[in-house]
Amino acid sequence: MARKSYLDFTALVDEYIRQDGWKAKTNSNSNYSLSGLISHTSASVLGKYALYNLYSDEARLAHDRGFIHIHDLAHSLVGYCAGWSLQKLLMDGFGGVPGQVETKPAHHFSTAVQHVVYYINVMYQEWAGAQAFSSFDTLLAPFVHFDHLTYRQVFQEIQKLVHSLNLPSRWGFEMPFSNLTFDWIVSPDLAEQNVVVGGRLRKEKYKEFQKEADMINRAFLEVVVKGDKNGRPFTFPIPTYNITKDFFEANGENQELLFKVTAKFGLPYFQNYLGSNLDPGSIRAMCCRLNMNTNELIRQPGNLWAKGDSTGSVGVVTINLNRLAYLGKNEKKFQKLLQKYLKIAKDSLEVKRKVVEKSMADGLMPYSKHYLGTVRNHFSTIGVCGGNEACVTLIGKDLSTPEGQKLMLQTLRFIKEELVKFQKETKQLYNLEATPAESTSYRFALLDKKYCPGITLAGSKEAPYLTNSTQLPVDFTDDLWEALNLQNDLQTTYTCGTIFHIFLGEEMDNWKQARTLVKKVAQTTKIPYFTITPTFSVCMTDGRFKGKVEKCPKCGGETEVYSRIVGYLRPVSRWNKGKDMEFKERKTFKV
């Protein structure tokens, strides 16, 4: 037994040092380092602890054999992701934890920005994934006014924020996964509210400070459009912009900056409040919503990364549709298997919720306990992976066909019906998410290959993967509008977490072209959340180049090729084998 344990731990350490196996590159935000090694080894121990001590044997076997994926097992004692109330931070200050240094509420812009950085860094240690604030520009604008700041002074503080959030600050040598949502135009639900400065309400209203909000937006965009000294993009915070009816007519000078950043790096995420049925005010609605109607699914406020105030997810389980299609052989048996594994997912999420509530009550999440106190407004999240491959397996046609579209729409609607039943049974919130599946799609494919001879997979024999959620095959088309049309109904069937990435071979020629494209997508489709994602390359010596350039044309050195892995920009060299193959096979759109 001792010899076996020694060999197991030796293999575990060697796996990371050699960067071998899917677990070694499970998260491209974690950089190769001693801290990464410690994270890798401890994550394996904590993951095993969770599977054997928290979850049922049925859930453990379903996960181990690839029927489901229980996300972030290393963080099984804490929640998945969270959106926070910036207003509460500005009112209360930073602290509330016994034995830890506390600060008074911010009286000045520089202090407020510093508190945001502190808060995100600390909360990222208490949760598995993304941490988000909404209305960053609106809520901090009054501080700029009362401090009588020049634009240069605002720029300096925003520059500090961006650089601070791009430094590793958690085990695994990870940058804090953070999102800031910018209103662009003062949000109607905040416009008539009294501003918070220095921990107290003042007589002034937020609608009076659009000019200062514009300064904050300009400063942020001018920082990120330059990148770092070598031309690398800033991965975090992920900026989300709310596209409302006046979005394209407001802030003339900032429009050019925003779409220069979009054309060059593709950093901004766009939340579509024009073509979709989303409500901009819902971002803060969960804070005071005490009585949920569990007879229907509600759309989770925010989006995949930018969760609404005081909401988020306690945990995520993804279902392997490809495996169920392979074993089911026909649609009726497929649905029966789906129902079975949805129940297993539900049971595991109910366990997770109880564990997180206990962790918070016992002080394992001390800052979350102070600022949140409960996860009653946090969702239990279920997602799917391999929808395209499931179509091929069941009906011999992929997701781009009418038959494939019909099958997956029926599947998603069936899942939603089951989630309503779960809500009625548990009195907890459930949602259906197009989960990112950064490592899950590769892990599922490896296990499908192991257990299911002849099963349909994307990629190659050496680097297989499943297509994310119910997305189109990555090599299906370079026609953007065809792809958008085929994703319109599918993406709006989910209740959270959908993103459509407009992948481009290189940056767009000018900002006006980017603006026109974003406007057209927002006005003519129902897609809730989308990005423009150009490919670009960075040489440590000679800077940035358009498109995929693996060798620097000036010095001949290796470059870093950048694109989005499921939702954030990272060098392709940091991706796992499955996602790397997906990048190689992907057709970029012509615009």
What residue spans do the PLM features occupy?
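Extended amphipathic alpha-helical segments enriched in small hydrophobics
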Residues: H378, I382-C391
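Contiguous hydrophobic segments
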Residues: C391, D448-A463, Y568, V572-W575, ...
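Generic secondary-structure boundary/loop-capping signal
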Residues: A130, L321, R376-T381, V566-V572, ...
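Conserved catalytic cores of very large enzyme subunits
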Residues: A2-R376, K397, T401-K554, E558-V561
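Metallocofactor- and cofactor-centric catalytic cores in central/energy metabolism, strongly enriched
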Residues: V154-I158, V162, T393, R570, ...
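Long, charge-rich boundary regions
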Residues: M540, C555-V591
